[in-house]
Amino acid sequence: MNKFYLMIAYEVTKASDGENPEMKKLIREVAKNNPEIMERCEVFTADRGYDDTEIITDLWDEHKVKAVIDIRNCWQDKDEIRMFENRQNIIGYDNFGTIYCYCPESGKRREMSFSGFEKDRESLKYTCPCKAYGVQCEGCKTCPYANKSVRIKMEEDPRRFTAIARSSHKWNREYDIRTSVERVNSRIDNAYGFEKHYIRGKKKMKLRVGLSLLIMLVMALGRIKEKQPERMRSLVARVS
């Protein structure tokens, strides 16, 4: 699915089939059959049902596509903070990849400021809150990271440390776009009559779904040819 709410690839499966294996197959098929699409693609968004390290790493390593996928809370303590090794017990992170620092004097925890993604280093850069926000910290004189930045390599934990930081506003904006899939599913159910259907058998269902998506794409193409791109998703507006 793209930002225009139009289908790029699809598959009809049994309800018992796993989503992640099917998604991996679809990504490989698009990369093989339509490499120009993967070359233009910058961000891949999906809900936590597709939270999978292999999907995230393959998208970045093979195609340099940034995955924006919600993460499941797999830690027993949802408020747990894990400390990085070789960071002098000062820098830590939570299950969602948010980076924190601890004052070496008071032990107070503060969220560090995300300062950007360094593609060449495949690292996320975070800045000391004293420098970023001007906060007062008792341990500034003794903290080795005071008024400095730290880099977190993606490879340390690809699920949590993604190219678009999970704690950033950009991540939230991109994640909201995933609703395009839900809107297309809603259109298939309502406009194309799949919510109440009497189709039996996977082959028949695949044919009907394929025809519906084809109609959707053809109508969008017609709108574009008629210089009405703003109506490419409309099913009822007249082509003048």
Each language-model region and where it sits:
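Detector for glycine-centered tight turns/loop "hinges" at secondary-structure junctions
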Residues: 5, 95-98, 107, 124, ...
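Generic recognition of cysteine residues
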Residues: 41, 74, 101-103, 128-130, ...
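Short amphipathic alpha-helical "interface-anchor" segments enriched in bulky aromatics
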Residues: 81-118, 154-200
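Long, low-complexity, polar/charged, intrinsically disordered or flexibly structured peripheral segments
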Residues: 119-163
